[in-house]
Amino acid sequence: MSWLVGALQTFGSLADVAGTVSNIVYQQRQAAQLEKQNELMETWMNKQEALQKSQMELTRDLSINGPAARVQSALDAGFDEVSARRIAGSGERVIWGNLDRPIMHAGTMDSIRQTRHLDSLSHSLATFKNGTPFGKPAPPTAKSGRPQATTAQITIGHNPGSTSV
């Protein structure tokens, strides 16, 4: 019987040793996985940092050179200088007569300038508003020289009326 008990104890001890060895192997694999995960995380963080630096440089460049690049792009597309600045966001207004001119392509601008239709419409609207210059009195002229001295006048005995409520 002792032989059987000894064999069972041996098998039990071998099973314990096998469990311990498999536990050690598992822990080594787990440590290797964590090391690989840390390396991947470090690589990812380095790439994120590089992307953020690149984004900051791009934002800085666009904030400095962006408006000029938009104006140049609009000029290259065929817009005149004022329209190109307006496209870039300058907020300028161009008023011809009584009309606020929209943003136009340079070819459109040339055709308007050649026909002068917009100018004639503006003059006709101004005629309706101001009338014709014929038969009007001359506009006042500016006086030259020193101004005339005037004396102050004080009204004494002013009696403001009374009210009854």
UniProtKB/Swiss-Prot annotation:
Record keywords, A-Z: Capsid decoration protein, Capsid protein, Host cytoplasm, Virion
Biased composition (Polar residues): 147-165
Major subcellular site: virion
UniProt record similarity statement: Belongs to the vesivirus VP2 protein family.
Other remarks on this protein: Translated by a ribosomal termination-reinitiation process from the bicistronic mRNA coding for VP1 and VP2.
Domain notes: The N-terminus domain points away from the virion surface.
Quaternary assembly: Homooligomer. The portal-like structure consists in 12 copies of VP2. Interacts with capsid protein VP1.
Function: Minor structural protein that forms a portal-like structure at a unique three-fold axis of symmetry, following binding to the host receptor. The channel formed by VP2 may allow the delivery of the viral genome through the host endosomal membrane.
Full protein name: Minor capsid protein VP2
